[in-house]
Amino acid sequence: MTIKFLSESTINRIAAGEVIERPASVVKELVENAVDAGSTKIDIILERAGKNLIIISDDGIGMTDKELEIAVERHTTSKLDESDFLNIHTFGFRGEALPSIAAISKMLITSKKQGADKAFQIKLIGGNEKQVTVSVHNEGTKIEIRDLFFATPARLKFLRADKTELAATVDVVKKIALAHPEISFSLTHDDRNLLKFKGQNKDAETNLKQRIIDVIGDDFIKNAAYIDFKTPDFSICGYTSIPTYNRASSEDQFLFINNRPVKDKLLQVALRVAYQDYLARDRYPLCAIFLQIDPQLVDVNVHPAKAEVRFHDPNYVRNLLIEAIKNALTNKSHVTSTTIASDALQLFKNPLVNKQPSVSKAVSVNSKPADYRPAMSPSFKPTPNTACQKLIDTLPHAKIEQEVERRIEHEQQVHKQYKLGAAKAQLHTTYIISQTEDSIVITDQHAAHERLGYEKIKDYLKTEELIKQRLLIPEIVELPNERKADCLYENREKLYKLGLTLEKFGEKSIIVTEIPNILEDVNVQKLIQDLADHLSDFGENIALTELIEHVTETYACHYSIRAGRKLSADEMNALLRQMENTPFSGQCNHGRPTYIELKLKDIERLFGR
């Protein structure tokens, strides 16, 4: 076959295949264009999840008839200065979106330039039959996309169910709406309003907070730490959830670079590292984090859909993000999720009666109904029986030394002033019940002490080496490639301080002679394989932190107070005071709460008071 030039329509369809994967891709490109046009209001209408119809309307600057003709040609844009290609501040800049979408659909664009007398309209079918006519329209632009992928039936065949495609579009709109709280957004599907976000015109922090409440929810804000971190060429702001408020998936993690939503592996790893001391590996924090960086230090032109970025100094960015998140979490290190207490109260209101053993319905002939009360007239008012009260008052009381009683009362009053209150009782030798001025607190003694031990051992490992145990038979670990073996060998001195002694054994193998004493039952093969993976994929800091976490968790769990151990009042109060003075004592090492606080007003509501 001879080499030949492709037709313009074929080129556009190929470009569409790179940029336009599904209806959500169309919505993303067109809404981003509307944002770049300076819109304050953007409305999206869909039919059949966008397969039949997509309409995007905005009140932006609009276009003239000449601009309409140029806009649907490839590589035409108003957003890119050729002399400064690296200094990009807009969403779009390649000039590919409109012609790519037009090539695979039936497109109608109606637009009126701000201050102009007339509106104009252009119609394209499969990218052809371009015709500009005079029309009637308000200032701004409306783009209608019908029969998406009609020109590429193979792509249409691979679209998912309407529900799945719609969910992808909703996700796209939420991300763009989060990045632009000053703009109003609405999304309607088959005449049903799905999203409606009102634009905010207050200060930036208030605008962002309200938009996050609209998109992610009020519970998130109540259980999130505010991030405000700045360097001369870098700033990070947003909200990230406290460890006890987490999810089973990462779908509520929103990350932005210069207001551009991205899914970047480096940023996701940084997020994981920031939380690895506080969350189990199968749990994920929620966040909406915005990184502002000099455009010349980040390349957004590495992916057709601009969903990925490349940093000039990725390690610097990663470390700053980890530091910013940890600083924010430290400010809320003693707080547990507000939803935990509400969930507990809900269980009180609706006990799991179905899980209780069934009770025989047989009743004794002499038994009375549980709610039996003697009949009395509505006007009846009981009067106090003073004689009975006097009799009760004369009953003997336990003989308690007055001085001891006063001392205990004084100590209780002092302890009640603390955040976790004064210890009152121990339930099932597992849970500490304490009282504050306006609540009761239930503390899991094992989880709490494990966290305290974890933090103490972490501090110890910063200055001291771990006790090592020599293996009777050294373990030889064969790795997939030489690069991973080299990564381990290059970090052998740091691993030695953590109790791991190893040497190279051939090109792709490592021989382990000593391990941390506390990890006597560890699977050495798996430990070394995991370390090698983390060192090669994520870098030295993350891999070594993973090992420290593993060792520290084992120590903390082994030496912590066990459930089932009886504690004195002094021991319980001492544990509570330690928790108040220890960072991140509100959750165990797996993100579960160490205590639950029930407010007195909520308890009173349970009893209808």
From Swiss-Prot:
PROSITE patterns: DNA_MISMATCH_REPAIR_1 (PS00058). Pfam families: DNA_mis_repair (PF01119), HATPase_c_3 (PF13589), MutL_C (PF08676). GO terms for biological process: mismatch repair. The keyword DNA repair applies. It comes from the Bacteria. Keywords: DNA damage, DNA repair. Belongs to the DNA mismatch repair MutL/HexB family. This protein is involved in the repair of mismatches in DNA. It is required for dam-dependent methyl-directed DNA mismatch repair. May act as a 'molecular matchmaker', a protein that promotes the formation of a stable complex between two or more DNA-binding proteins in an ATP-dependent manner without itself being part of a final effector complex. This is DNA mismatch repair protein MutL. It comes from Rickettsia felis (strain ATCC VR-1525 / URRWXCal2) (Rickettsia azadi).
